[in-house]
C-alpha cells in the first residue's frame, strides 16, 4: 500500500483532519497557520493575523527569522545528527557559547522544555545524595501552587492543577511536590510567599535537595511575585544547602526585558537555569540545563542522556537564535516595547468600564484579566474569538485571563493595532453569543 500525503490543505480541511486523526489533547482556536514572518501569520486562504502568543514565547525573535533559517539551511546540508556516542563540532561551539552567554559553567543539552525540567529534577536528586548526603530515597523537591513545568510525570507531580494536568494520572512521584512537607493534603506552598518555604525548610530542610520555581508564573496567568522574592528564596536555600532551580523556559531569552527574568531580582543567581522555547527561535526543539561545573559533575557517563540532545543542527540553530537576541538588542527592545504595551493596556483598562480588571506582566510578557460580571458572563475565550476576527491571535489561560506575548521584533504600530483590536472586541463582548468552550 502506497500512502500519499495531502499537502497545502485549506483551513477547513486542516481542522477536519486534525480533529479526525490526532489526539484531542489540545483545544486550539479555530485558525490555521500556513506561513509566518516576524510578528505576522497567514492562513491557507491568505488572511493575515498578528501573533500575540509567539508559540508560548518560543518565537521571541519572530517567525522564520532569516539569520536563524540560514543557519538551519547551511547546517542541514552538512551534518544533522551524530548522537552523543561521538563528538560534533557544533555542539562544542554551542557549549562554549551558551555558557558564556548566560554566565554559567556547564550545559546539559536536551530537546524540549519538559526534558530540561526532568533533567534538572534528576540532577538535583543526584546532587542531594552525592553532595548533601541525604539518606537514600528521601530527597525532596519542592514546587509552588500554580506552577507549570510541563506534562511529564515529574512535572505533573509538582503541579497543583487537578482538573487538567493531574486528573487520572496518579500515582505521582514521591517527594516531588508543591505541598508543604508534613502539612495536610491541601496545604500548598503559595507562590511568592517566603514564609511557606521557611516552614517547609524548618521541618524538612535536611531532606530538601531543591526548589524549582518560575520567576513569573506563565500558565497561572502571568503572576508576578514581589521584586525581592527570588532574592529571599535563594538566601533561604543557601542557608539550608538547597539548590534553587529557575525555570526560564517561558520567561527567558529577553521576554521580560532582561536576558533572563531572574535578573530583575537583586543579588540573585540561581544554581540551575532551565532554557527552551526561544533558545532556538521557534525553529527546532532545543532546551538545556545550565549550572556550575560542581553541580553538573554529579552526572556521570550513563547516568543521563538524549539521542538528539546537542545534535549539530539544533546547536547551530541555537547559536544563531542567541546571536539575534544579542545583535538586535532584543533585551532593550522588550523592556521598551513592554512598557509601551502595558501603558496602552492600562489606558484600555480605564476605558473598559471594569471589563478589564487587571493588567500585569514584565517586558512583553503581559496579561489582561477579564471580569466576567462586567462582561455579561463572557469569558476570555469569547474575547479571543472576537480578537481573531479582528486579525489578532491570543489564547486564554484559565477562564478569564489572556496572555499577550507578541514576538519581540513587533513594531509599535502593530502593538497599537493589537490594542485597538482588543478595544473593538471589548465593545462587542457583552453581546456576543456565549461559547461552549
Swiss-Prot record:
SUPFAM superfamilies, sorted: PLP-dependent transferases
PROSITE patterns given in the database record: AA_TRANSFER_CLASS_3
Key words of the record: Aminotransferase, Pyridoxal phosphate, Transferase
Listed pathway(s): Amino-acid biosynthesis; L-proline biosynthesis; L-glutamate 5-semialdehyde from L-ornithine: step 1/1
InterPro entries per the UniProt record, alphabetical: Aminotrans_3, Aminotrans_3_PPA_site, Class-III_PLP-dep_AT, Orn_aminotrans, PyrdxlP-dep_Trfase, PyrdxlP-dep_Trfase_major, PyrdxlP-dep_Trfase_small
GO cellular component, one term: cytoplasm
Class of enzymatic activity (EC top level): transferase
Record Pfam families: Aminotran_3
GO molecular function, one term: pyridoxal phosphate binding
GO biological process, one term: L-proline biosynthetic process
Keyword Transferase applies: yes
CC cofactor: pyridoxal 5'-phosphate
Keyword set includes Transferase: yes
Domain of life: Eukaryota
E.C. numbers: 2.6.1.13
Known catalytic reactions: a 2-oxocarboxylate + L-ornithine = L-glutamate 5-semialdehyde + an L-alpha-amino acid
Family according to the record: Belongs to the class-III pyridoxal-phosphate-dependent aminotransferase family.
NCBIfam families: Orn_aminotrans
UniProt-recorded name of the protein: Ornithine aminotransferase
